[in-house]
């Protein structure tokens, strides 16, 4: 048989792996609030297809799939979704701002992206019944690949920006720096190898990618009608 898989590489980001480990260990307790950002500062509209208004252009199609995939990997599908999409830069022809609220029975997930953020935004803000986690900075793997670096390298995936973990112990709040575990994009390819050899599961089956696509389309409808839409 054939294996169809989708490269949702952001599941192997350093900060996401760190956060996933925290949740698996129950360090934060029950998560009530999860906020995830992909922000940048690019005030000038560039002459490239992603910004020219054609099919699939704009950051809702470009960046939101990563954030949506991470959210449903952690929490599953939401009950409903409310999305605001906009073109905020002068001359913008495609979406350069999004703000999505994914509603769960006891949780709210905020996914945000903009191209007009000169100040640094937190990558993650997570609040739970036992503590909080806040992380700044982006996983370094994409930038290193763009710079022509090749594997293997001993320091691959190391993120020099650590997060802050705040625990609640009785009446006290204890704040500590939390080391960010290394990112690991190569793990996706190792998992694909194992899946092809019949030695492991498909790391990102098509069914999971379809869920993300459905949320992308539902978000567009939500923004169009300025309404909260429930998943079927």
Predicted regions and their residues:
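Predominantly a Rossmann-like dinucleotide-binding segment in NAD(P)-dependent oxidoreductases
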Residues: 2-3, 10-91, 226
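C-terminal helix-rich "cap/oligomerization" subdomain common to oxidoreductases
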Residues: 151, 177-179, 187, 191-232
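Contiguous beta-strand/loop segments that form the cofactor/metal-binding neighborhood of enzyme cores
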Residues: 69-153, 186-202
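Short catalytic-loop micro-motif centered on adjacent basic/acidic residues
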Residues: 4-8, 110-112
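Structured beta->alpha junctions
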Residues: 8-11, 38, 115, 208
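A general structural signal for well-ordered alpha-helical segments in protein cores
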Residues: 13-16, 67-68, 161, 185-190, ...
């Amino acid at each position: 048989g054939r294996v169809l898989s989708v490269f949702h590489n952001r599941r192997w980001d350093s900060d996401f792996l760190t956060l996933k480990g925290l949740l698996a260990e129950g360090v934060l307790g029950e998560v009530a609030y999860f906020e995830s950002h992909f922000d940048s500062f690019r005030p000038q509209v560039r002459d490239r297809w992603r910004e020219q208004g054609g099919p699939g252009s704009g950051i809702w199609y470009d960046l939101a799939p990563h954030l949506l995939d991470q959210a449903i990997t952690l929490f599953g599908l939401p009950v409903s979704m409310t999305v605001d999409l906009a073109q905020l830069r002068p001359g913008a022809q495609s979406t350069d701002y999004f703000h999505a609220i994914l509603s769960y029975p006891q949780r709210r997930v905020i996914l945000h992206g903009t191209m007009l953020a000169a100040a640094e935004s937190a990558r993650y803000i997570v609040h739970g019944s036992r503590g909080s986690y806040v992380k700044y900075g982006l996983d370094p793997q994409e930038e290193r690949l763009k710079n022509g670096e090749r594997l293997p390298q001993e320091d691959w995936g190391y993120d020099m920006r650590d997060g802050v973990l705040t625990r609640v112990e009785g009446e006290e709040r204890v704040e500590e720096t939390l080391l960010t575990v290394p990112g690991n994009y190569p793990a996706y390819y190792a998992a694909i190898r194992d899946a092809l050899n019949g030695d492991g599961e498909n790391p990102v089956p098509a069914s999971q990618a379809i869920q993300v696509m459905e949320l992308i389309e539902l978000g567009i409808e939500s923004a169009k009608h300025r309404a909260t839409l429930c998943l079927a």
